[in-house]
């Protein structure tokens, strides 16, 4: 986790995995000049060196664990940058499922709640991709969008608003995809009864 030391005796905590951790640290260092880092970015246990600060907000990006309600309740705002359009693309590996099922791809910033990937939405934006584009290609577009939305979120929080312009999720609530579903398809696609079109789409989705 990375801590941002900020004004008004507040703090913004960042829960990041290694995919985005270095980029975020470097970006904030060069653009905001206030990053403080401790612990290994790929580990979940950190020593809190800023325990005297108030708990204002946190941003999560690709964090591998589900946050407990007690952890969520520590912050006024606890926002997650999700690599899918919510509430449709919930759960693990949304870009994979977007490519396999040829559904809209994008990224969402939302408040973390007890219902996974279904909190009020701050930002939600789609990326365009073609029918025969690989998961690798679509993911690169989504990742660039996530970076942009992360910066927009951090900038918004840096002003310490008492409220954020969040909207209730609308549309179909998607399945909460599990990692086991992905690994089952990846390991058994040659033994599944897939149509030719499904097989082609799965090969594209597995190209990452």
What is the meaning of each model-derived region?
Residues 1-208:
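One-carbon transfer enzymes
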């Amino acid at each position: 986790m990375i801590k941002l030391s900020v004004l008004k005796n507040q703090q913004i905590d960042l829960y990041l995995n290694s995919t985005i951790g270095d980029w975020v640290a470097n970006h904030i260092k060069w653009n905001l000049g206030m990053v403080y880092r401790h612990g290994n970015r790929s580990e979940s246990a950190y020593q809190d060196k800023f325990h005297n600060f108030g708990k204002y907000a946190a941003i999560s990006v690709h964090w591998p664990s589900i946050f407990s309600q007690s952890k969520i309740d520590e912050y006024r705002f606890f926002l997650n940058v999700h690599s899918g359009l919510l509430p449709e693309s919930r759960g693990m590996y949304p870009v994979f499922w977007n490519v396999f099922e040829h559904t809209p791809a994008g990224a969402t910033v939302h408040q973390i709640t007890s219902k996974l990937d279904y909190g009020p939405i701050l930002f939600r934006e789609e990326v365009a991709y073609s029918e025969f584009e690989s998961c690798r290609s679509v993911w690169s577009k989504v990742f660039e969008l996530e970076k942009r939305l992360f910066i927009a979120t951090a900038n918004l929080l840096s002003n310490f608003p008492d409220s954020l312009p969040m909207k209730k999720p609308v549309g179909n609530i998607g399945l909460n995809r599990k990692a086991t579903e992905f690994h089952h398809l990846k390991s058994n696609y040659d033994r599944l009864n897939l149509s030719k079109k499904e097989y082609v789409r799965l090969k594209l989705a597995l190209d990452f």
